[in-house]
């Protein structure tokens, strides 16, 4: 895949840098950056295209802190830069197609299980898989995606409500107060409580 290709290029740069020093590696980093730009363009197009095919109104992203200088190793800089680039390109494409972009707090979306069982344990051999506290095996990215979507819907469900009704729901589902720990299970519980409140 394109992602694997990028990792191979970064591996070759790392080996070359160890053997020849950092001065002679500039052209190789320039190639990696061009490859990164192309990868960002393809991913952004695929995301916007998929959203349009499925008649989505909104594309939800994790909020990335984009102010100030990016610190850290070049590999980390490149990775964060691609995330920013993808979001920016997606935003332009989404607006052209009549869709909105929304961002939610990124904290703990990957660390917490979508079923509300607690923190996940990453598989040491396959980093894309994890184990929930209840023993369930799950895909890490899928669990995080559920949590990202849940945080968006929790915010959108609570925002238009009168203060008294919102406070009542937050008392019944206390976890929705802290957005940094909201998961998909909290959305389901909130929705059930809203249905009961309407039926009363």
List where the protein language model places each region:
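Positively charged, helix-rich recognition surfaces that bind polyanionic ligands
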Residues: 1-200
């Amino acid at each position: 895949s394109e992602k694997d290709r990028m990792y191979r290029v970064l591996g070759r740069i790392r080996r070359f840098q160890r053997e020849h020093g950092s001065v002679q590696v500039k052209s190789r980093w320039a190639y990696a950056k061009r490859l990164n730009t192309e990868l960002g363009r393809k991913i952004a197009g695929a995301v916007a295209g998929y959203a349009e095919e499925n008649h989505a109104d909104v594309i939800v992203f994790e909020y990335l802190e984009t102010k100030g200088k990016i610190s850290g190793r070049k590999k980390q800089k490149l990775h964060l830069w691609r995330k920013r680039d993808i979001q920016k390109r997606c935003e332009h494409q989404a607006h052209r197609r009549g869709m909105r972009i929304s961002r939610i707090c990124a904290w703990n979306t990957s660390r917490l299980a979508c079923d509300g069982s607690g923190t996940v344990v990453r598989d040491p051999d396959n980093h894309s898989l994890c184990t929930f506290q209840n023993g369930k095996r799950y895909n890490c990215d899928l669990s995080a995606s559920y949590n990202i979507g849940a945080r968006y819907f929790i915010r959108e469900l609570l925002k238009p409500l009168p203060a008294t009704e919102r406070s009542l729901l937050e008392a019944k589902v206390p976890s929705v107060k802290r957005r940094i720990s909201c998961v998909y299970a909290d959305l389901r519980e909130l929705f059930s409580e809203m249905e009961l409140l309407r039926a009363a």
